[in-house]
Each structure stands twice: as structure tokens, then as C-alpha cells.
Regions:
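Blade/loop signatures of beta-propeller domains
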Residues: 96-141, 296
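Extracytoplasmic electron-transfer domains, predominantly the class I c-type cytochrome c fold
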Residues: 29, 38-85
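Detector for the c-type heme attachment site
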Residues: 28-37, 57, 117, 424
């Protein structure tokens, strides 16, 4: 605290103008360019000073900030984190529960124990009273404000307890009134959902941004053990949520080297996506699997004279699925980061749960090599791979289900706008169906849902920095399991002309990018424009809607606003639905609200 006060004095008395100059010289050219779809400087005022320092020292901006001294980084982080200076985010208090969590609290109602609800990633809650007839009676019961500008991590709910992440803290709240049972502070930022330990039902696992794995006592929040997953490079990140089957905690590995590649001095690219398996009892690392073989030099760039490397990329952005019976893991991968593109990018991969060995890999798009340098004029000719995209990776979790004959199948949606059904044993594509135009931020982005008869697909189709062959088709789509035929579609109307971010300068966009969820005959979907809605699974018609682009009074006293709904999907338990609002990445509308709804 004394150091922060000193820095505030330093900035205000000695170098406010210099701080502004540092930001202008080092940050503004990219973060004030609307065409790059990056978080705006004004939206960064929702970040804390410690979060900004993490980004500059260890995160996505480490390469770009490498020429700055530690003092300059601290000045920039304090200057940008105006909320800590001006008090915009002050006033939070600890609304503590009057008692601790009891074992009965964990078992007396239904749960949503992981990112995809179950290990098949169905995102379908079978134990809820919400249906098409009563969903219109949903009311907002409470809201919780976090200290960041993105509500990125999806909550999970275990009985009467909801677990939600806030920067480097995990909060255990009462799901009916939002009071706090306990709070656990991690060593680094929390980007993803925790997962319930299915063996004892009384502990949870979470993974921070530095690949520190924690096992916590769910009743008390006390640490049981911590473990560290070895990674090849600091640019590897655990973006997607972990999943569990028995003694195996499966942790997906991604990479933000796509951002580092915008620096022509960077030796692009060496990182790879991967999977790690951690023993749920001891925390020991059972195995790790790198998707790509070790990168090899391709020689030096003709202009930069910097060495280039491949293969690289194939990040795992989605929570894997697990077939416990056949001891298999399944997941999708991202694009390659350097040409030549590999055979494992933009692919669905099946892997042995016990050994971590690949069983099969089905690539749906060849030649997709792309990094963020491809979007920056003046730099892209130096750093963009020869194949130049189109960046159509798999961001959404792969779903396992069964066809009419009772045979296991896999269902996958891609940013290209294509949806695929695959044979679970061979990876052979049974059918594919085009539901969206696709794009860097388009097509199917974060997650689908199913009732084991039809597949329900959200489409973003947000246009970004390139021309497209067809008009965008943002909306919801229902596909038949057997042939992939589109049964119905709900097109999302564009209302962005009348909408403006409540914090920062993020832009409104039209589309369903966040994962969707369902229960009974109702589908819940959050939109990039901030609307949260319920739709009939029979025909897609809208049954209920709540506009989250507003200010909220929160149970923890933290001022909160809603914004774009992206990434994390709705969580449904009994008569309750929980949703995050606020996502400033890609130049979208910042926000910091977690909202709790229930039936009257």
C-alpha cells in the first residue's frame, strides 16, 4: 500500500505529464486504433494497477514493454488504473454470510460443477424448473461487482454455493443472496472456471495464469495442495477451464504468442498448444502433451533478418471433453502462428486419457497460419505468415452425444461458421453444415448446447478488418443431429446504433459470441450488445429478455455496470440463472457485473 501511495505521489507530483507521454508513445498507437479491435485505453481504467503490471511484465505486452524500465511500467500502470486513483471502484465491502458452508449446502439442490456442466460439454441442466411457460417470470435478485473490466471466468454452482473469480481471487457466495462465505487469493490471475472434485464432492480445483494448480477445501476455502504445470514458454497460458475424470485433472494449454508476433524483433513462432494431466489426489503431473512437434528454424526473414520458426500454434482455447468409458479426451485447436501451417491446427483431436497420446486428429481447414501482425498496416508484410489466415480456429468446446442408433458422436463448431459431426472412433466427418459467414471473431466462438436430439448453435459473425463473401448472419440456429439440416434460425436484430458503453470507449457489436446454455425447452444466450435472452428450443422464438447494459447496485458494494456478454455462458441451477456481463477484449463494451436471476 505504501508503494502504491508513493507511486501516486510520484505520478501526480513529478511525472503526470511524463506518464501521459509514456502511454501515448508506447500504448496509444495500437489501443486507440479502432480497426485493431483491442481494449481501449479508457476501458483499462477498470483494471487494477497489479493487473496492468502483470500484463506488462509477464503477460501479452511483455515483449512490447521489454524496453521499459520497471519504474516506467509502474508509472504507466498507475496512470492507466485511474479507478485506484479516482475512487471509481471504491466502496466495496465484505457482505459476509452469518454461517459457514455446511455439507448439506453442497447436496440439497442441483449443481453446475464445471464449464460445460458435464464432461460431454452438453451445457444442458436437467434439474431445473425453468421452462418456456414460466421463464418470463425471471427477475434479477442480486448482482456482484468485480474489480476488473472483463467478467471472463464462468462461475460454477455447487448446491447453495456459487464460486466466481475476480482477478486473483475466488469468491464463495451464497447463490440465493450473494453473501460471502470465504475468499481465496491465488498467486496470479484467474481466467477460467474452477471445477468440482467429483470424487469427494467437497473440494475444487482451479488454475491461475501462471499454471499454478490449486486444490481447495470447498467448505472452508483452505488450500489442500498446490502444484505447478511445466510449460515450454512464458507465452503459454491456461485460457480454457480444467475438467476432471477420476484421478485425472485435465488442463488445456494455450498461447498468446499471436500477440507477441506483432513485434518484428520477435522470433516467431515457437509455442504450441497442449494438454496436461494432474493427479487429483497428490497434485503430481501425470503427463503433458505438446500438440506440435518442437519448432525448427526456417531461416531468417528477408527484411527483418530475424529467425522464423515452425510449426507453432494449435492452441487449445476450449475446455476438453472426456469419455470416461473409453478413456478418451476430445478438444479442438487453434490456427498455426507461422507458415507452413501444420496438420494439427484447426483440428479436432482425440487423445488417450491415461497416456496423453493422440488417437486421431481431423483437420477441417488446411493452410491456416495467422498472427495478430497480419492486422497491422506497415508491419504485416514483415511478420504475417505467407498463408495469411483466415484464423478459423476452434474456440468452442466439442460436444459428445449419441445418434439415433445409440452410437457415440462428436459435434464441433468453428469460427469459420461451419459445424461438424464426427465419428468418435475414427474422427471421420459424418456431415458439415454452414450456419455463419465466419471470421476472426465470427462464426461459432465459445460454445454450443444440445438436448441430445438437436444441436443449438450461437453465431457471432462479427466483421473484423477484412471483406467477406456473404452478409453476416448473427443469431441462434438449431441443427438436426442426423443430417445437420438447419431446423430453425433466430436472427439477432442490430440495435447498436443507439447503444454506447457505460465505461470506456468499447463498441457495441451484434452477435452471439458467448457460450449458450439450456434447460428443458429453453435456451439462454448472451449477446455482444449486452442483451441476455431466453429462447424456445422448439422454434427459437424469444421468450424473455433482460438488458444488462446498465448500472447495478451490488451486494458487495462495488459499483458495477454491464457491457458486452462474451466468452462465459449462462449457468442454470434449479430456478436460478447466472450470467456475466462485461467484456472489453476485441474493442467491446467493458463491464464488471455478475447477475443472478430466479423465477418469481
Amino acid at each position: 500500500m505504501k508503494r502504491i501511495l508513493f507511486l501516486l505521489f510520484f505520478v501526480s507530483q513529478l511525472a503526470f505529464a511524463d506518464a501521459s507521454k509514456l502511454v501515448k508513445e508506447n500504448c496509444a498507437s495500437c489501443h486507440e486504433d479502432e480497426g485493431l479491435n483491442l481494449i481501449s485505453l479508457s476501458s483499462m481504467t477498470y483494471l487494477t494497477q497489479s493487473e496492468l503490471m502483470y500484463v506488462l511484465q509477464k503477460g501479452k505486452m511483455k515483449q512490447q514493454a521489454s524496453h521499459l524500465s520497471i519504474e516506467e511500467k509502474e508509472v504507466i500502470s498507475v496512470y492507466l488504473a485511474q479507478n485506484e486513483v479516482s475512487g471509481n471502484m471504491t466502496g466495496s465491502f465484505n457482505y459476509k454470510c452469518t454461517r459457514s458452508i455446511g455439507k448439506r449446502d453442497l447436496k440439497q439442490s442441483s449443481s453446475w460443477p464445471s464449464w460445460g456442466y458435464d464432461n460431454f460439454n452438453s451445457r444442458n441442466q436437467p434439474n431445473s424448473n425453468i421452462n418456456a411457460d414460466n421463464v418470463k417470470s425471471l427477475k434479477l435478485r442480486w448482482s456482484f461487482g468485480i474489480s476488473s473490466q472483463d467478467v471472463r471466468a464462468q462461475p460454477i454452482v455447487i448446491g447453495e454455493v456459487i464460486l466466481l473469480s475476480d482477478s486473483d481471487s475466488l469468491h464463495a457466495l451464497n447463490r440465493k443472496n450473494g453473501c460471502t462465505y470465504w475468499k481465496f487469493t491465488s498467486k496470479a490471475r484467474l481466467r477460467n472456471a474452477p471445477v468440482l472434485n467429483e470424487i469427494d464432492g467437497e473440494s475444487i480445483f482451479l488454475v491461475d495464469s501462471d499454471f499454478e494448480v490449486y486444490k481447495l477445501n470447498l467448505l472452508s476455502g483452505e488450500l489442500i495442495w498446490t502444484s505447478k504445470i511445466p510449460i515450454d514458454y512464458e507465452s503459454n497460458i491456461p485460457s480454457a477451464s480444467p475438467v476432471q475424470s477420476g484421478k485425472y485433472l485435465i488442463v488445456p494449454i494455450s498461447t498468446f504468442e499471436t500477440v507477441l508476433a506483432i513485434d518484428p524483433r520477435h522470433e516467431c513462432c515457437k509455442t504450441s498448444g497442449g494438454i496436461a494431466a494432474v493427479d487429483t489426489d497428490s497434485g503430481e503431473i501425470i503427463w503433458t502433451h505438446r500438440i506440435e512437434e518442437k519448432s525448427k528454424t526456417l531461416g531468417k526473414g528477408l527484411i527483418t533478418r530475424i529467425e522464423k520458426f515452425a510449426p507453432a500454434g494449435s492452441a487449445v482455447w476450449n475446455a476438453p471433453g472426456i469419455d470416461r468409458e473409453d478413456k478418451r479426451i476430445f478438444f479442438g485447436t487453434g490456427q498455426s502462428l507461422q507458415s507452413p501451417a501444420s496438420n494439427y491446427s484447426d483440428a479436432i483431436i482425440s487423445m488417450n486419457l491415461e497416456s496423453g497420446e493422440k488417437i486421431w486428429a481431423t483437420q477441417t481447414l488446411k493452410g491456416d497460419a495467422y498472427n495478430m501482425g497480419c492486422e497491422i498496416p506497415g508491419i504485416k508484410r514483415l511478420v504475417c505468415p505467407e498463408e495469411k489466415g483466415p484464423d478459423f480456429d476452434f474456440g468452442a468446446s466439442v460436444i459428445q452425444s449419441k445418434n439415433q442408433e445409440g452410437e457415440k458422436i462428436l459435434l464441433a463448431g468453428q469460427k469459420s461458421g461451419w459445424v461438424f459431426r464426427l465419428d468418435i472412433n475414427t474422427g471421420e466427418i459424418s456431415w458439415k453444415s454452414k450456419v455463419g459467414n465466419g471470421g476472426t471473431l465470427g462464426g461459432v466462438h465459445f460454445g454450443m448446447t444440445t438436448d441430445n436430439k438437436n444441436l443449438y448453435v450461437p453465431v457471432s459473425d462479427r466483421k473484423v478488418n477484412r471483406d467477406y463473401d456473404n452478409d453476416a448472419k448473427p443469431g441462434l440456429y438449431a441443427l438436426d443431429f442426423e443430417g445437420g439440416d438447419i431446423l430453425w434460425e433466430y436472427r439477432l436484430d442490430d440495435i447498436c446504433e443507439s447503444r454506447k458503453a457505460l465505461h470506456g470507449e468499447g463498441k457495441c457489436s451484434t452477435g452471439f459470441s458467448a457460450a449458450i446454455s439450456m434447460t428443458n425447452n429453453v435456451i439462454f444466450a448472451g449477446a455482444l450488445d449486452g442483451r441476455f435472452s431466453a429462447h424456445a428450443s422448439e422454434d427459437g422464438s424469444k421468450l424473455w429478455e433482460f438488458d444488462t447494459l446498465r448500472d447495478f447496485m451490488t451486494v458487495n458494494g462495488m459499483p458495477a455496470v454491464g457491457g458486452s456478454i462474451d466468452s462465459a455462458g449462462p449457468v442454470i441451477v434449479d430456478d436460478w440463472v447466472f450470467v456475466n456481463s462485461g467484456y472489453s477484449q476485441h474493442g467491446q463494451m467493458a463491464g464488471n457485473a455478475i447477475l443472478a436471476f430466479s423465477l418469481d
